Regions:
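Bacterial Sec-dependent N-terminal signal peptides
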Residues: 1-24
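A generic structural signal for short, solvent-exposed coil/turn residues
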Residues: 11, 27, 35, 58, ...
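Intrinsically disordered, low-complexity boundary segments flanking structured domains
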Residues: 20-22, 52-58, 122-127
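N-terminal "domain-start" segment that seeds a small globular fold
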Residues: 20-29, 133-137
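Local sequence-structure signature of Cys/Sec-based thiol-disulfide redox active-site neighborhoods
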Residues: 26-62
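Short, conserved sequence motifs used for protein processing/export or organelle targeting and
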Residues: 68-245
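A short, hydrophobic C-terminal helix/tail in secreted or cell-surface proteins
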Residues: 246-250
């Protein structure tokens, strides 16, 4: 059994308000942006989403809050059925990989973004960062003795009155397994840079470190949704207890 590694207990608010911290200069809050991505190990084009999410993390650091929702295929060992009711299909027009930024209602590509160009999702992210942050959030988390649950607490302060819904999300990094179930389908392995000329996609292309492994490649997954307070939907609470799950290597 492999224990998932908790690296972040991400907290965000719906209505487009993501987790913020007061700026060091005292001028309001520094906006952080949530990107929820639909993905799955049986999604052959999802390496594009893996690349896009990593790019956002590398570019924007802790201002990026990534939530990789593995709901494309139930055979995915990271599959999580209990999450928000998001219409990822956008009325049947979209498929995986796709993402939504700060619950703005727009389903876009996690690499091409809304504009459709290489790496253009960064432009969508930057527009979201420019929006005013009206709430400040401080989150803390503590594991129990055997690392099967984490107690989370949030402190919220704001500059504007309003009704907000709070959601706790537990994500994990460096998630991997040794069996076939953990391998990522990679449709890019048969293509060269003549088709996809981008350094970030290159490892998944023909001859790349992942592409040379064939149709399925071994990958270490980041920002993986492990649990959320949606499991307790309708329950009032001051603290939220989120449970992890042990993931089998098979």
């Amino acid at each position: 059994m492999k224990r998932l590694l908790l690296l972040a207990a991400s907290f965000f608010l719906l209505m487009g308000m993501s987790a913020q911290e007061r700026r060091a200069d005292g001028a309001g809050y520094e906006r952080k942006v949530v990107v929820e991505e639909l993905t799955g190990t049986a999604c052959g084009w999802c390496p594009r989403g893996l690349v896009g999410m990593k790019m956002l993390r590398d570019l924007y650091g802790d201002r990026f809050i990534g939530v990789a929702v593995h709901q494309f295929n139930a055979t995915d060992p990271m599959y999580t059925p209990d999450y928000a009711d998001i219409d990822w299909s956008d009325g049947g027009l979209k498929g995986a990989p796709c993402c939504m930024i700060d619950r703005n209602g727009e389903i876009i590509d996690p690499f091409y973004g809304s504009a459709g160009g290489m790496r253009d999702v960064a432009k969508d992210f930057e527009r979201a960062m420019e929006e005013k942050a009206v709430l400040g959030v401080t989150v803390s988390g503590e594991w129990n003795a055997d690392y099967t649950a984490v107690q989370t607490t949030a402190q919220v302060e704001g500059t504007e009155a309003g009704r907000y819904e709070m959601v706790f999300v537990l994500v994990a990094d460096s998630v991997a397994g040794n069996t076939q179930r953990w391998r990522q389908l990679n449709n890019y392995c048969g293509y060269t840079r003549d088709s996809f000329d981008d350094d970030l996609l290159a490892p998944f292309l023909q001859g790349g470190s992942y592409g040379q492994q064939g149709d399925y490649c071994k990958y270490i997954f980041e920002d993986v949704l492990v649990g959320s307070s949606y499991k307790y939907k309708g329950t009032q609470y001051s603290n939220c207890l989120l449970y992890t799950s042990d993931a089998a290597d098979d």
